[in-house]
């Protein structure tokens, strides 16, 4: 990496003030829920990663302190400690002025993932207090801030040092983050581990010093993204060792690693300057284009594709592919589409990645002849399966559509009266008896009921062609009406919310997992948009008195049950619901379907890698990883009258508020 750029006081540019951050924090960190809270940490970590990315330092330590504050320390050059050209100490400018950072105008960095300095000021604005300690030029400097960014001390020289680097410690402001200011070790772990995978020489340590939560993890991967791909494919049956390519074109550094497994879906993770581009972009397009072209050329060369045969589609070639595409782009070329950094727009990145892959992949295919031939045959089978699936989809959308759809849905779907797709809800209900109660108890205007009678297929282990043959899944696809797989278009959905409602037992939980697996793999935008929910029917009904003095209460947890038992005193009757069918329509409406009183869990995908690995663990072919996960996470010996919601990680929110449960 180029080290000629001078990271000094004059390289920090000031663009605008910081006044609006506390008034509208969502504009700067996305939200003030747990995502926004953890985003604060990433802003500071990204600054440290930028140092490593540009060749300065190789260690980052993140520590959750006993008091709930968090420290991020690196061994980079240390922030500039002189006087800025604006007349203020540079450290104060970095932490109190928005858009004051080393990125702007390429003052201090050749490549940068974050907006260096921007993050620091936003974090300061949203903190109860913040302290920075700098080791630079043989001296230790310290400055502190409080109450959302006001300096509580000047930049003070504390002593001598032989080290270099920056340490930032802050405590999030609980008047901004009202839900919680408690950091989640596992959430931080995923992001930090990702950074370590992407930079071979980077060592990251994550510590938790909180009482009862003491824990430490180290992340250092000498083989970089090669190990990243292996990590993503854990628990899957892989077809070969991880392949890696590196190169440079147009001043852009390109690193690619890939490995095929025996599954039917692809997983491509792309990064720009160590920042995940969740929506892909030009670098991902370059990778896919080159893969498709090279594989087709190879297939024709070995005569698996004849002259009359049409080319293999990229989707067929990528079936079962796991890949990581990482590019490093100079600041002057870096462009993103839209307001977020989730999609790369740099046109040069497409040709750079295409060039590197097109240069290296043919040699790999020739060298691994037997494997390459089997991958081509795998793609041809995928093409045949896709054609079969396409015909099934055309059946659903062609002239036969209405007749077949009516046949599929007759006697099953009880539709909503309204055609307002922005308000309508679809309840997927376990069993006929509960479906009957739900039909009678629902609000006919906007709630549709689809009872699930047969077996739902495990879509983790099935091709799309076979999924179409499963009556329950096929009915769900027709009912939602937005397509499936790569053809799924969320804007065509007939429903704003899809709510899974099952019994609170192991069979019900299994149906939930099967449905969530399907939605995650084949209707992912629906999950990503937060439009898939799990209904939480109560576990207990308590009744006391008669006539006008009669009192009926419901409990969703054992804790609520104990509280109500004490409140009601002696003489009440207790019913434990073992199934939805035990509730009459009025009770089902009141407890589980009425937006004013019901409790729902919103299913969210916070980290795609972690979610995908969890689905593979729970729903894949390998028994041992599933057994290990269950032994670690499930507490056995639960009595019949105990609640599955005893898990302290699940927070129940009422009155149509949503607990965000990650799959």
Swiss-Prot record:
Is Magnesium a UniProt keyword of this protein? yes
Q: Which residues bind ATP?
A: 7, 47, 74, 114-120, 341
Any idea which UniProt keywords this protein has?
ATP-binding, DNA-binding, Isomerase, Magnesium, Metal-binding, Nucleotide-binding, Topoisomerase
Query: Which ranges are annotated Basic and acidic residues under compositional bias?
Result: 387-398
Q: Name one GO cellular component term.
A: chromosome
Instruction: Name the coiled-coil region(s).
Output: none
From the UniProt entry, list the residue stretches annotated as the region Disordered: 386-416
What would be an example GO MF term here? metal ion binding
Q: Which Pfam families match?
A: DNA_gyraseB (PF00204), DNA_gyraseB_C (PF00986), HATPase_c (PF02518), Toprim (PF01751)
Give cofactor(s), names only.
Mg(2+); Mn(2+); Ca(2+)
The residues the record assigns to binding Mg(2+) 2 are: 503, 505
SMART domains for the chain: HATPase_c, TOP2c
Q: What EC identifiers does the entry list?
A: 5.6.2.2
Swiss-Prot/TrEMBL site (Interaction with DNA) positions:
455, 458, 510, 626
What's noted on cofactor binding?
Answer: Binds two Mg(2+) per subunit. The magnesium ions form salt bridges with both the protein and the DNA. Can also accept other divalent metal cations, such as Mn(2+) or Ca(2+).
Sites where the protein binds Mg(2+) 1: 430, 503
Q: Cite the Toprim domain residue spans from the record.
A: 424-538
Q: What class of enzyme is it?
A: isomerase
Query: What InterPro entries does the entry give?
Result: DNA_gyrase_B_C, HATPase_C_sf, ParE_type2, Ribosomal_Su5_D2-typ_SF, Ribsml_uS5_D2-typ_fold_subgr, Topo_IIA, Topo_IIA-like_dom_sf, Topo_IIA_B
Q: What does this protein do?
A: Topoisomerase IV is essential for chromosome segregation. It relaxes supercoiled DNA. Performs the decatenation events required during the replication of a circular DNA molecule.
Stored NCBIfam families:
parE_Gpos, PRK05644.1
Which proteins does it associate with, and in what oligomeric form? Heterotetramer composed of ParC and ParE.
Q: Which PANTHER family match?
A: DNA GYRASE/TOPOISOMERASE SUBUNIT B, DNA TOPOISOMERASE 4 SUBUNIT B
The UniProt similarity line reads: Belongs to the type II topoisomerase family. ParE type 2 subfamily.
What's the protein here called?
A: DNA topoisomerase 4 subunit B
């Amino acid at each position: 990496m180029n080290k000629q750029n001078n990271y000094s006081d004059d390289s920090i540019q000031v663009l605008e003030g910081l006044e609006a951050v506390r008034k509208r924090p969502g504009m700067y960190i996305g939200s003030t829920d747990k995502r926004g809270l953890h985003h604060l940490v990433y802003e500071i970590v990204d600054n440290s990663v930028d140092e490593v990315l540009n060749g300065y330092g190789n260690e980052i330590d993140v520590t959750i302190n006993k008091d709930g504050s968090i420290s991020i320390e690196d061994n980079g050059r240390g922030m500039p400690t002189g006087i800025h050209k604006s007349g203020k100490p540079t450290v104060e400018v970095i932490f109190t002025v928005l858009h004051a950072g080393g990125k702007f105008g390429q003052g201090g960095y050749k490549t940068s993932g974050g907006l260096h300095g921007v993050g620091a000021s936003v974090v300061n604005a949203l903190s109860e207090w913040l302290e920075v300690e700098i080791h630079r030029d043989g001296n230790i400097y310290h400055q502190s801030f409080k109450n959302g960014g006001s300096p509580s001390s000047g930049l003070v020289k504390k002593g001598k040092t032989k080290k270099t680097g920056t340490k930032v410690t802050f405590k999030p402001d609980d008047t901004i983050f009202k839900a919680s200011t408690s950091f989640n070790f596992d959430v931080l772990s995923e992001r930090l581990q990702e950074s370590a995978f992407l930079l071979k020489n980077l060592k990251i340590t994550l510590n938790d010093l909180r009482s009862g939560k003491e824990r430490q993890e180290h992340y250092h991967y000498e083989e970089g993204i090669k190990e990243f791909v292996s990590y993503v494919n854990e628990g899957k049956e892989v077809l070969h060792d991880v392949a890696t390519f590196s190169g440079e074109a147009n001043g852009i550094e390109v690193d690619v690693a890939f490995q095929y497994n025996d599954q039917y879906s692809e997983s491509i993770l792309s990064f720009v300057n160590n920042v995940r581009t969740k929506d892909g972009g030009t670098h991902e397009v370059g990778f896919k284009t080159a893969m498709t072209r090279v594989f087709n050329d190879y297939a024709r060369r070995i005569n698996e594709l004849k002259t009359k045969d049409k080319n293999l589609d990229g989707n067929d070639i990528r079936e079962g592919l796991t890949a990581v595409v990482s590019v490093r782009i100079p600041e002057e070329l870096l462009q993103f589409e839209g307001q977020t950094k989730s999609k790369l727009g740099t046109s040069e990145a497409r040709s750079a990645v295409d060039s590197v892959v097109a240069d290296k992949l043919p040699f790999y295919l020739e060298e691994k002849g037997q494997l390459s031939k089997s991958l081509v045959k795998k793609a041809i089978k995928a093409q045949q399966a896709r054609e079969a699936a396409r015909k099934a989809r055309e059946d659903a959308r062609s002239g036969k559509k209405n007749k077949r759809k009516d046949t599929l849905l007759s006697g099953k779907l009880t539709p909503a009266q309204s055609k307002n797709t922005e308000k309508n809800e679809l309840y997927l209900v376990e069993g006929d008896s509960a479906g009957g109660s739900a039909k009678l108890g629902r609000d006919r205007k906007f709630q549709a009921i689809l009872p699930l009678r047969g077996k739902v297929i495990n879509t983790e282990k099935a091709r799309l062609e076979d999924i179409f043959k499963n009556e329950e899944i096929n009915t769900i696809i027709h009912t939602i009406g937005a397509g499936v797989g790569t053809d799924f278009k969320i804007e065509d959905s007939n429903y704003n919310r899809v709510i899974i409602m099952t019994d609170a037992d192991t069979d019900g939980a299994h149906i939930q997992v099967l449905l969530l697996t399907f939605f995650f793999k084949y209707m992912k935008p629906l999950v990503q948009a937060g439009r898939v929910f799990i209904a939480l029917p109560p576990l207990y009904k308590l009744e006391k008195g008669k006539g006008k003095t009669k009192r009926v209460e419901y409990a969703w947890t054992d804790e609520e049950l104990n509280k109500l038992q004490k409140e009601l005193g002696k003489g009440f009757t207790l019913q434990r619901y073992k199934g939805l069918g035990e509730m009459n329509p009025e009770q089902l409406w009141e407890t589980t379907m009425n937006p004013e009183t019901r409790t729902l869990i919103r299913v969210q995908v916070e980290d795609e890698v972690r979610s995908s690995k969890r689905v593979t663990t729970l729903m894949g072919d390998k028994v041992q990883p599933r057994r290990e996960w269950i032994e670690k996470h499930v507490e056995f010996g639960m009595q019949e009258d105990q609640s599955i919601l005893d898990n302290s990680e699940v927070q129940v929110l009422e009155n149509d508020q949503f607990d965000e449960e990650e799959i």
